[in-house]
Structure formats: C-alpha cells, structure tokens
Amino acid sequence: MHDDIVYPGPEGTHTAAAASLLHEGARLVPLAGFRAVADAVAAADAGGGVLPIESSLAGAVAETHDLLYERSLSIVAETVLPIRHMLAGPERIALDSIRVVRSHPMAFDQCRDLLAQLPGAARIAVSSTAEAARLAAEDDDASVVAIVGEDAASLYGLTVLADDVGDHTAFTRFVSIGRHTRLDVDEAAARTAFSFVTKHQPGALHAAIEPFARAGLDLQRLVSRPLPATPWKYRFDAVVAGHPLDPVVRGALRDVRALTRELRVVGVYEGHEEEQ
C-alpha cells in the first residue's frame, strides 16, 4: 500500500474522480474519512492522498485545512472539478411519491430548490453522495432516493429521476497531499501555500499580509482557522501566486515571518489552469 493513493471513500465520490485525474494510472484506495487519509500519508503508509479543500459555493473545507497543519503535510498538486448533482433511485418514481432523500449535507445545501419541491420528504444526511447512492441501491423501497453524482449513480446502477438539480453551477478544488514539499514546479504556474499565526495585537493581520501587496504579489486565498489550545486566537492558511524560490516571493515570505509568531510553507504546486 506504500505507493497507493488514498482518498476518503467509498468509490464513486467526486474525490475519487479527482484522484484518478491527479494520479492517472495509480492504484486508488478508499479509506474511512479525511482523518484516515491524512494519517496514512503522514505515516508513509500511502504514497499520497487526495482531499477536497474548497467549494465554490460553501468555501473552505475546514477539516482538510486543519489536517494538513496538524499532520505537517504538504500540497503537491491541485485540480478543480465541476460538481453536478442528480436525484436518483432504484427505479423510476414520481417526485411527489418520494418519502426520503439521502445525501451529504453539502449536497443538501446546494440543492435547496429541488428540496423545496419535496416538502413531504425526510432528509437523511450520510457521509458522502456515493454512500447515499449505495444505500439507495440496496433499499427495496423506491420512495427512498438520493442526491448523488453521475459516477455514483452509474456505479450503483441507479435510475436518474432528475438531472443537474443543483441551485447554481458548483466547482470543488481538490488537492493531492504528501509528506514533503516539492520545489520542482514550473515557476510561471507555481502557487505557494503557507500557514502563519499572527501576534495577538491590533493590526497584526493587516501587517502580516501587507508585504505581498507591497511586492505586487497576488494573495489568492486566505482562510482563518481557530487554534484549539488558545481560545480566540487563529491560524491563517494562505496561497500566493509564485514560487518560494523566486526572489520577490522569498522576500515577501521573509518579511511575513518577521511579523508573525509562526510561518511555514505547506505546499508548492502548479495552480489550476483557469487561475493562471
């Protein structure tokens, strides 16, 4: 398993699709959740892992951010996939006959218009849209359906009752994670991910990010995460366009390090082509 690529299962998830794109030809192994993936990579029990890190509708995936920091892992690649939801079940049924809808909580949140058309249907949250598809396939009751992705519907042989049921066009960013930071990345397309903890004083965050503006660098993402051991204090995860060995980027990071309590680079990788 040491060369396998792991992802939060089961099969048929959008993360599985992202893993196949990021690691073409590799053996993909589903594990029981985000934490299991991070632990396997950190312990060198897997060659790498794939996790979702950002939704265009729901924002940052907090668990992924926290696991990368806590396990000292690094982002080595990214991809962005369109997320298309569909309503599917074991057989064709009228929408007004549906009693139960299963899906992941994020899918429920992204399909509110559909759910408004099913006021009498109970909602049951499960661990993934693929798990919802599996349960629907195993259920003998046609009135129990699921909001799933195309791959999961096909994998479990479900009948599509309504296609493209999301309220808005949605995309999710997925990252490939490893134990070490790579530097062999095309500088023109490079992104540098880093985490920092500010000093606990007024204006500390503004001071910490000002070096990037002064250097004319594009700070593409900034996510705040609480520090559990120190209530009301926060860590910031950020991405800047550029390579950390580029003199301008290196200088900005050096300035930020001098202004913060902690700074660590947590990934160097090629940015998704739509953002280049």
PLM ranges: what are they?
Residues 1-276:
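Domain-level signature for soluble enzymes in the chorismate/prephenate branch of the shikimate pathway
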